[in-house]
């Protein structure tokens, strides 16, 4: 779309020759958890993570960036799902590069304990946001 899209290679390389994608899980339009998905630079475009860390949105984004992610989710009607965010190494800017209406849940490479914590956090946020208050 003219004026709405563009193509750019985001330099999301981090220390150790890895790239890092930030998968932000959205519940009720807000980031709840972040999976830091890391893989070797030469496998940048493959889904072959060598390390996945569970993190909090406030540790990955500024409050202004969280507001941007929330506005993006609202603009596309994303109450529940996941967005992939890349941070450019030289500018520090974030780029939302993908949105999924069915979040994939914890990545395979995440350790079991972190998978369970992530699933509980998402379930709790989902229950608070969407479960009926009536019994």
Predicted region positions:
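PAS/PAS-like sensory domains
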Residues: 4, 78-81
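C-terminal active-site "lid" helix and adjoining low-complexity regulatory extension at the edge
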Residues: 74-78, 87-135
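Hydrophobic residue at the +6 position relative to the catalytic HRD Asp in the kinase catalytic loop
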Residues: 83-85
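Phosphate-binding site of ATP-dependent enzymes
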Residues: 1-73
